[in-house]
From Swiss-Prot:
EC number: 2.6.1.9
Species assigned in the record: Shigella flexneri
Biological or metabolic pathway of the protein: Amino-acid biosynthesis; L-histidine biosynthesis; L-histidine from 5-phospho-alpha-D-ribose 1-diphosphate: step 7/9
Protein name per Swiss-Prot or TrEMBL: Histidinol-phosphate aminotransferase
Family from the record: Belongs to the class-II pyridoxal-phosphate-dependent aminotransferase family. Histidinol-phosphate aminotransferase subfamily.
Modified-residue entries (N6-(pyridoxal phosphate)lysine), positions: 214
NCBIfam families assigned to the protein according to its UniProt record, in alphabetical order: hisC (TIGR01141)
SUPFAM superfamilies noted in UniProt: PLP-dependent transferases (SSF53383)
Length: 356
């Protein structure tokens, strides 16, 4: 008699799934954490809502209205979720038939697009970016048949560059009437002039992902947004769980999106950009650094001699970076979050001491 294990009972695609390796899952015993693109210091908030005996609103009014005003869109064009990661998944659940439809994304890029699709049983198609990490529009066009959702991260994680806006327009024309194009703008606060939020009126099939995890310094809050036309938002509302935001999360998010909160965020962004330029300049002078790539974000991608040895050496010193060696076209690359000046100096000093 054959014995069926619990794992045997699981769906085949889940048994075969490689989970996303978040910075926290990868662990490490560091005191300089530069591997998750977080803001380096905590921002203080006081809870004002004490109604924890009641279920929260599905889409808290203050959060939606404040974000709509900040993003320059209408409240009915905003959906709030448990981080932008939930937004990624909601779009697949709303638009893709498992076993029939596909998503498409362009590596090297953020890893959750594929994990979300594979979890649901939706095919993943990839079209690697060109040498300058811009979109291969011909390659995308050739693979669009059967694709319902296209994910494009801009600025792109982990490479740090913006996608050419004319290429975005071409992609939106290629997909009109065929697929949803998702612009992942998790890092847009560091280059707000590049946002596509003003394009929603032109493109009914455009969706934009946003988060409070980066420039708003609230990675621990797990609060993200999808901006899209009302027809898209209404479909996402059909598949979102009934209470995506807890009362404390909604309380703090509304405060972070107040006029004072927006000013504080802008000041943080200016400080991070100053620190980023300091770190880029220093990295370019270090012998073990072969190449430093331009960045529009709060992190820097660089290519190193003996990158695995450098990564481990810094890890052993409590400086935790993000190894990008396994990503397509990123051999020898490490990603460094921009932290405080003290953290930057720790990285610079450690790299200068490397004998490779």
């Amino acid at each position: 008699m054959s014995t069926v294990t619990i794992t045997d009972l699981a769906r085949e695609n889940v048994r075969n799934l490689t989970p996303y390796q978040s910075a926290r899952r990868l662990g490490g015993n560091g005191d300089v954490w530069l591997n998750a693109n977080e803001y380096p210091t905590a921002v203080e908030f006081k809870l004002t809502q004490q109604t924890l005996n009641r279920y929260p609103e599905c889409q808290p009014k203050a959060v939606i209205e404040n974000y709509a005003q900040y993003a320059g869109v209408k409240p009915e064009q905003v959906l709030v979720s448990r981080g932008a990661d939930e937004g990624i998944e909601l779009l697949i659940r709303a638009f893709c038939e498992p076993g029939k439809d596909a998503i498409l994304y362009c590596p090297p890029t953020y890893g959750m697009y594929s994990v979300s699709a594979e979890t649901i049983g939706v095919e993943c198609r990839t079209v690697p970016t060109l040498e300058n990490w811009q979109l291969d529009l011909q390659g995308i066009s050739d693979k669009l048949d059967g694709v319902k959702v296209v994910y494009v991260c801009s600025p792109n994680n982990p490479t740090g560059q913006l996608i050419n806006p004319q290429d975005f327009r071409t992609l939106l024309e290629l997909t009109r009437g065929k697929a949803i194009v998702v612009a992942d703008e998790a890092y847009i606060e560091f280059c707000p002039q590049a946002s596509l939020a003003g394009w929603l009126a032109e493109y009914p099939h455009l969706a934009i992902l946003r988060t409070l995890s980066k420039a708003f310094a609230l990675a621990g809050l797990r609060c993200g947004f999808t901006l899209a036309n009302e027809e898209v938002i209404n479909l996402l509302m059909k598949v979102i769980p009934p209470y995506p935001l807890s009362t404390p999360v909604a309380d703090i998010a509304a405060q972070a999106l107040s006029p004072q909160g927006i000013v504080a965020m802008s000041e943080r962004v200016a400080q991070i950009i100053t620190e980023r330029e300091y770190l880029i300049a220093a990295l370019k002078e270090i012998p073990c650094v072969e190449q430093v790539f331009d960045s529009e974000t709060n992190y820097i991608l660089a290519r190193f001699k003996a990158s695995s040895a450098v990564f481990k050496s810094l890890w052993d010193q409590g400086i935790i970076l993000r190894d990008q060696n396994k990503q397509p076209s990123l051999s020898g690359c490490l990603r460094i979050t921009v932290g405080t000046r003290e953290e930057s100096q720790r990285v610079i000093d450690a790299l200068r001491a490397e004998q490779v």
